[in-house]
Amino acid sequence: MFGRRREKAPRPVPQWTREKMLALLVGAGVLGLVLLVGVGLCVYYALRPAHHSAGGGNGTTTSSTTGTGSGSGDGGSGSGQDARDALAAKPMAQVDDAASHPSAVSTSPPGAPIVLPAATRVGPAGVPTGYPHTSEGAMAQLAAIDQVALQSGSLGTAHEVITQWAMPGGPTAGTWSGVQALASLLTDTQTAGTAQLAIVFTPLMGQVKGTVGPDFVVPCVDFELDVTLTQTARGAVADCQRMLWQTDAKGGRWMVGPGAEPATPASVWPDTDLAISVGYRDLTKAS
């Protein structure tokens, strides 16, 4: 599932508005790749709501590690919570929207990959879990949460996922950017008059924005999004979340912690020079 890919670069995707594409479909009476590109971009923009952004900036990513804060099993308090909020809100590198479109992969050394641990059991809402109490474990858990929610193509499933995996004070079924993204995608496909929809959400790159103590991590995952109706459109979508370690009878699990969603990360086509320059590293699966 994970790993660096070296493939022939697809042709550039036209940057048309969703309204323009839908007008074209009405006039032509066909459902083509152009609509699919619009659907993919719809998800991309839905994952960038106003509450999910904390400012601009450009260039390299602002990775940060803080040694304060503690509290497995709670949302944190005092200076620890302040440090978590500051880390989550810290702006990340910003790129042009076109960076999310398929592009030529880099020939430069990508650096050491991030090895994601394997799940050891299935958790609430059918989400793989059992990841270790490490930054890599937090990243693997975030990837699993997003994959199950988005690939389901079901708002009911997405609601259940975030309800089961977010702590009180965190994203809800009504506010989570993942639910908003899926709702936008489903709205467009219903407008197109088809129920034949397949979504593949593959984590290919990632970075750890920072940590606060051993129990709080802000991992960021850069996914390849493939949306198929009659043809397939592809794009990149990135997500960062506050991941907080919670102990339980089975040892513990990473959950989405309380507070506003972190500043928006760069959604960059994986393995490009730009993806590497903003701090992303390839993801590989532990053997």
Predicted segments with their positions:
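Short, solvent-exposed mixed-charge patches
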Residues: 285-287
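Juxtamembrane and targeting peptides
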Residues: 39-141
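Terminal targeting segments of Actinobacterial cell-envelope proteins
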Residues: 1-23
